[in-house]
UniProtKB/Swiss-Prot annotation:
This is Mannose-1-phosphate guanylyltransferase ManC. Keywords: Capsule biogenesis/degradation, GTP-binding, Lipopolysaccharide biosynthesis, Nucleotide-binding, Nucleotidyltransferase, Transferase. InterPro entries: GMPP_N, Man1P_GuaTrfase/Man6P_Isoase, Man6P_isomerase-2_C, ManC/GMP-like_b-helix, Mannose-6P_isomerase_type2, NTP_transferase_dom, Nucleotide-diphossugar_trans, RmlC-like_jellyroll. Involved in the biosynthesis of the capsular polysaccharide colanic acid. Its EC number is 2.7.7.13.
Amino acid sequence: MIMRQTKLYPVVMAGGSGSRLWPLSRVLYPKQFLCLKGDLTMLQTTICRLNGVECESPLVICNEQHRFIVAEQLRQLNKLTENIILEPAGRNTAPAIALAALAATRQHTDCDPLMLVLAADHAIANEEAFRDAVRGAMPYADAGKLVTFGIVPDLPETGYGYIRRGDVVPGATDAVAFEVAQFVEKPGLETAQAYVASGDYYWNSGMFLFRAGRYLEELKKFRPDILAACEQAMRGVDPDLDFIRVDEEAFLACPEESIDYAVMERTADAVVMPMDAGWSDVGSWSSLWEISAHTPEGNVHHGDVISHKTENSYVYAESGLVTTVGVKDLVVVQTKDAVLIADRHAVQDVKKVVEKIKADGRHEHHMHREVYRPWGKYDSIDAGERYQVKRITVKPGEGLSVQMHHHRAEHWVVVAGTARVTINGEVKLLGENESIYIPLGATHCLENPGKIPLDLIEVRSGSYLEEDDVVRFEDRYGRV
């Protein structure tokens, strides 16, 4: 197969708000934005995995409420180039990939670019094997095939869908791909054992490679309603900082469907490229334990942990010391506002705990005590009747919106850095150990004019203290 000169356009799916890694994963800060292995988040690791593959800057698709998290993580990699598509609501993978394909064809009018579709929350141990599989699949995709990457199974996993391979694709290169004979739903154990023994089945990874135009052609053939809704949503694109904000009303009218059901199971041009790269979808605490580095006792430690007579356990300490004595096969995860203790073999039921938290009207499933904003972050240290205490960190050169509150007053004490505070038009500079009072109803603004982070303690007092008591008059992040 001879490839034409073409451009490879990575598309990273960063939607979703999974509950299986609670309490680390929350609705407002799901697992793809967490550092679970090493210093990079799962999203950042997914992007860096492409180092060594010649490609364009990635296009990331995410939920609107995660936009500033994604932007900051791309900025840290120097990959922020107006390349974030915001979904007003999740509509599964077929519509999301359609938005990316439409964006890619708009941006690259001189060619039909190859789209490498990746999930932001997968772990891959052998990254060179991953890159080899991508390079091997490119000639097939360039020739018009829709490539799905099939993971070579090393055990009879019942939690994944499978792909049964057919004949070798004619004209195969050194990297052999197979026609897709069948997509199979998650099997029972005996069936999965037979699949693995046969050598004809792969795990369905949810990673794809195809030309943007070919995907749109097949989507038009099999699900024209999805394509029409996405085209309408892209016609109403509203550029917003580094974001591509599609028309909300049009996209909400789009049917919800996966790419497997909408296209891959119907097209005559689906091929599977085998990949043996130590892949995991990190779908539970037990799978994270399996892919992490272990102590001689089989334990995985994160943070300040001391274990004694402990075996085959995962222990995560976010804040403070966590100790274990005389236990085995446990998952212990401690965050600032919640602790999970579970049998490592029963972690599939963590989602039931999350459902209970949600049903009880609590907030621990939704957000962490520490919350990230485009200007920095805040940590809710304490709260009681008619008061809240927060530690606020503002990044250098950033600032909060010009705002006012109907139901609360605020006291600010600068801990580190310099604060520029505007209250009812009067500007004051505050240094360390200086404080200021913001009366109820006052129009005010907080900025960091310095070169180091600004840290301050905020004490709120009033009859209603939640975040939605805010009226914004000006905002550099488009939140007015």
